[in-house]
Amino acid sequence: DPSLNDYTAKILADNKKCGSHDFLYRGLAHMWGADWSNISAKGMLDMDKELEDFINDEKDPGDFENYLIVPPFSQAEILKRTFEPLFSEVKLNTRVTEINYGSKEIIVKDQLGQSHSADAVIITIPLAILKKGTVKFTPTLPQKKREAIEKLQMTPGGKVFIKFKKNLWGDTWSFQNDGFIVMYLITGYHQEPEKNTVVEGFVMGQEAEIFVKASKEKQRELLKQDLQAFFGAEAFEENYEDHFYFGWESQEDIGGAYSFPSVADAADCRKALRETVDKKLYFAGEATDCNGYSQTVSGALYSGKRAAEELMKDFE
């Protein structure tokens, strides 16, 4: 099961090409939330195939043109507007510590020591937290599901946002370079030029571990080394205002960026992870998506819809 790194090296060697474009594959890995040495080439190709199978209408690939989201509307705002009646039922800052599904009635315990009963539970716990085992399942989850949790990976990662005094890139929407951060996107691409002044960089895997430990000045220097290749060191110095990094690994209840295909049978692992247990436990979350949208908010939302539909069908 070769990694994306090994696979790329073999392809280049077989075609007698130099590795000058290796960074493109490394950047692809960063978008997938990991270092390219940790991504299974087969697992990644299988996910691409899933997406092709799911979107089989070339003229209308997923109706994306109907769902363009631009500021000031965030994804959170869209959720609030769509599901506003349910928000009063959401209990925040209440971490679940145990799920006992050994009897007909399921008992869910939280960090405050309170117990909640239900006939069924939809579980959206992030993969990294499932791997830590901080939520106790009684009885233990089926072996196939535990093996899937062990095989799938979710490592540190996040995004850095760099604000400039003015737009230095015109209508360009992305930068790719063989630097510390390979992939940069323009967050204000759909905005007017005068509002389009922020660049977003994917910081994943080893780079995320380095970046989060660096001082802000050292982070700024790393960003300068990358971005000066596109609009020069002087322009960077004259127009840089500030930058902000957010890594999901810093969030105690999330623990990482998002899942990625770390093994050749990653698709089978995601199918095992999403399987219902005894018509009691229903699993959702981006890591359970099998339509090529794992690692995305879209995949997470779709998985929640799928789990809810499975539950309703079982309780008809």
Which stretches of residues belong to each language-model region?
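FAD-dinucleotide binding site
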Residues: 1-316
